[in-house]
């Protein structure tokens, strides 16, 4: 996961191919929802299968729960992705232009894609969050299911890490 503006800026070549769903769901309302609704379990199941380092890491009952939830939320899921290509980019650009940065401790945990995606997630996040802790976990996209101990440890460390700032400041 990257800041939205940075995500769209790095999508080319291999990253664009991996992120094809972003382009699909960024289209105007109607067609993306219709295409996904025609075979929602195939669409969402595809990502459950290819984004997990070990597809067995997601137990059958959890997979079913994910598919059921996604099936019922197609309009909301697509709207969220659509916003990422529009208003979210505008907001990120405005924040970047005015120097707004996250002033609280931030932990970014990413799955280990190696160098396949061609960007440095920590460097991209550091531009937004000066008090950044970055970790790479050997797993696929579904980190909570595939590496629960690592994720719980990182969350405990984040929640107990003192802030380097006396107060949270957001420029307005």
Regions flagged by a language model, labelled:
Residues 131-172:
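Catalytic active-site module of serine/aspartate enzymes centered on a nucleophile-bearing elbow/loop
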Residues 1-137, 156-161:
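Flexible "cap/lid" subdomain of the alpha/beta-hydrolase fold that forms the substrate-access gate
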């Amino acid at each position: 996961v990257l800041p939205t503006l940075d995500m769209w800026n790095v999508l080319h070549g291999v990253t664009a191919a991996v992120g094809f769903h972003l382009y699909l769901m960024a289209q105007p309302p109607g067609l993306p929802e219709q295409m996904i609704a025609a075979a929602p379990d195939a669409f969402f199941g595809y990502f459950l299968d290819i984004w997990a380092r070990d597809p067995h890491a997601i137990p059958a009952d959890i997979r079913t729960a994910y598919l059921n939830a996604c099936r019922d939320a197609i309009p909301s899921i697509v709207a969220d992705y659509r916003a990422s290509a529009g208003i979210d980019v505008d907001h990120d650009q405005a924040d970047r232009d005015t120097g707004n940065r996250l002033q609280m401790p931030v932990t970014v945990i990413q799955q280990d894609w190696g160098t396949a995606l061609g960007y440095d997630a920590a460097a991209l996040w550091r531009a937004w969050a000066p008090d950044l802790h970055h970790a790479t976990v050997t797993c696929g996209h579904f980190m909570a299911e595939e590496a629960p101990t690592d994720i719980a440890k990182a969350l405990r460390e984040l929640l107990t890490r003192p802030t380097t700032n006396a107060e949270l400041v957001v420029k307005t």
